[in-house]
Amino acid sequence: RIYHRTGFECGWRYGNVEKENSMKRRVVVTGLGAVTPVGNTVEEFWSSVREGKVGIGPITKFDTSEYKVKLAAEVKGFSAKERMDFKAAKRMEPFAQYAVAAAKEAFEDAKIDMSQENPYRAGVIVGSGIGSLQAVETNYEKILQKGPSRVNPLMVPLMISNMAAGNVSIQLGFKGKCTSVVTACASGTHCIGDGFRAIAYGDLDLCVAGGAESCICPSGVAGFTALTALSDSEDPEKASIPFDKDRNGFVLGEGAGIVMLEELEHAKKRGARIYAEVVGYGATGDAYHITSPAENGEGAGMAMKLAMEEAGAQPEQIDYINAHGTSTHHNDLYETRAIRYALGAAADQVVVNSTKSIIGHLLGAAGGVEFVTCVKSIQDGFIHQTMGTKETEEECSLDYAIGAPVEKEITYALTNSLGFGGHNASLLLKKYEG
């Protein structure tokens, strides 16, 4: 395979970075929302993370007796009618319900008063990698059993992935830019990155951004199993073990992670609490393979470099990386190479972990929840342990927070997402210092 020289090796940059940055507005995080396998609010989620609770267990959503894979990371005890208008919720599939619940939490956390806001300056960028496989399954069964005339008239709007963003917009009354990025497992991170850009360059003042997913269902589990992507371990403590020498696939998870992004001066004017600042975003394509990341890590590494370049941050300034870390053989090895490609010698000084060791792989929602994890880590000076991981292989040789969490002051945190098709996204957060 031929690998072309990268832009950094050739000595060029994407545009006039100094000029572009001088025109940008600063973007901060003022609200957090999450629905996860270890808690249905940010408070519940973060408490579980700090306690080292793992949200993986036997699949309860359908009979797995004929399935090789028995475990998943399901959302537990979620009640849509307690989180949103119940009539509206009945016209949403679970992924959209999770999105609305997390978005409302972020909105309320940010204490936005829409009577004081221009709704056309408030946007929604929320993605889902898949949308609803369940709606397809249910209605296909109706076609087989009762004929095509019995299909639910709402099948299409229930199924399509952009309805996460659509329903959030409807429920919050946000009338500005409303889009949905679909880049498989990088969807949530791309959405937050696009929200960051929309505010930085003046399209919006407020943006709820992130991802939502729910596809723990027969076709979802069967499809990923056929791809040999899922772990077939029946021990919840040993199923999702990123970077471990015995890893054998990811654990399918579900949920949503959505944040409120806001232009700094807008946030200060209304006296908002500021959690952190978003200072860099990098997005690249591997142009390599439909499921595997590039073996040399160049594409993902370049995304990290671009995020750092935008922020004017040096590799040695990065304190923490929340890795994509799926627990598949290829991803974890190639992402390790990507981190070394991006950070060089400084890679040996950074702490890396994988939240998927706790909540499994939330696909399009993963980046949103992992962004929330980075914000809370910066806030608390706490990097959670990569749960279950005991011993790494030779080339996976970074500090993966194995065996215990790490107490550390964090100024800069990177979060990575890699999606099928070669989609790479990295976001750089910074501790807010005024």
Model segments located where?
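ACP-dependent fatty acid/polyketide chain-elongation machinery
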Residues: 18-88, 110, 265-277, 372-386, ...
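Condensing-enzyme catalytic core mediating Claisen C-C bond formation in acyl metabolism
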Residues: 26-30, 57, 235-311, 320, ...
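Conserved beta-ketoacyl condensing-enzyme motif
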Residues: 29, 45-46, 50-183, 212-221, ...
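A glycine- and small-aliphatic-rich helix-loop capping segment at beta-alpha/alpha-beta transitions
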Residues: 43-48, 134-148, 198-201, 221-234, ...
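Active-site-proximal alpha-helical scaffold in enzymes
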Residues: 99-112, 161-165, 169-213, 251-272, ...
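Glycine-/small-residue-rich "gating" segment that lines the acyl/pantetheine channel
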Residues: 145-152, 190-193, 197, 213-269, ...
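Acyl-CoA/ACP chain-elongation machinery
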Residues: 203-248, 281-295, 325-332, 349-399
